[in-house]
């Protein structure tokens, strides 16, 4: 299941949505999708550059996607680490949207989110971070 825009027709047929788990949120203006993966002590923030005709949810198709490392605000990293600590986790894949005006929107954290394709695409040391985590060579997120 991927994110998609809810139409007026969807709302008119809202009874159908009652049969399945549904999460609704305000539509956030498209900006830059950012995946921040935290593995133990290591933080890997990556911009996901989508083509103009990409679906709302970049995960629906990876056709035409490009990736690059990016910086994230220190407060955002602290908040991610605080959330992991509160949840008792040492791994999390955080998804954000950064609007063109520079506002950051937190979408979700996935405690089992995918990461390997970014390790391969960008040559990141994510596997090494996971090995360190599994062997106990880390502090806590």
Q: What residues fall within each predicted segment?
A:
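Protein kinase-like catalytic core scaffold
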Residues: 23, 44, 92, 105-107
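Short solvent-exposed loop/turn micro-motifs enriched in small/polar/acidic residues
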Residues: 28-31, 76, 89-91
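Catalytic cores of transferase enzymes with a strong primary signal for eukaryotic protein kinases
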Residues: 22, 78, 128-129
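Hydrophobic residue at the +6 position relative to the catalytic HRD Asp in the kinase catalytic loop
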Residues: 94-96
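A conserved acidic, glycine/proline-rich C-terminal tail/linker
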Residues: 80-84
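Phosphate-binding site of ATP-dependent enzymes
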Residues: 1-72
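C-terminal active-site "lid" helix and adjoining low-complexity regulatory extension at the edge
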Residues: 71-74, 85-89, 98-141
């Amino acid at each position: 299941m991927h994110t998609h825009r809810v139409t007026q027709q969807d709302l008119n047929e809202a009874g159908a949505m009652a049969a399945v788990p549904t999460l609704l949120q305000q539509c956030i203006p498209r900006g830059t999708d950012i995946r921040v993966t935290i593995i133990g002590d290591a933080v890997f923030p990556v911009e996901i550059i989508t083509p103009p005709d990409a679906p709302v949810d970049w995960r629906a198709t990876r056709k035409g996607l490009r990736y690059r490392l990016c910086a994230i605000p220190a407060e955002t990293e602290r908040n991610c680490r605080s959330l992991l600590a509160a949840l008792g986790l040492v791994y999390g894949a955080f998804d954000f949207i950064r609007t063109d005006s520079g506002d950051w929107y937190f979408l979700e954290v996935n405690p089992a989110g995918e990461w390997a394709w970014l390790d391969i695409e960008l040559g990141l040391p994510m596997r090494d971070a996971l090995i360190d985590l599994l062997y106990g060579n880390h502090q806590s997120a």
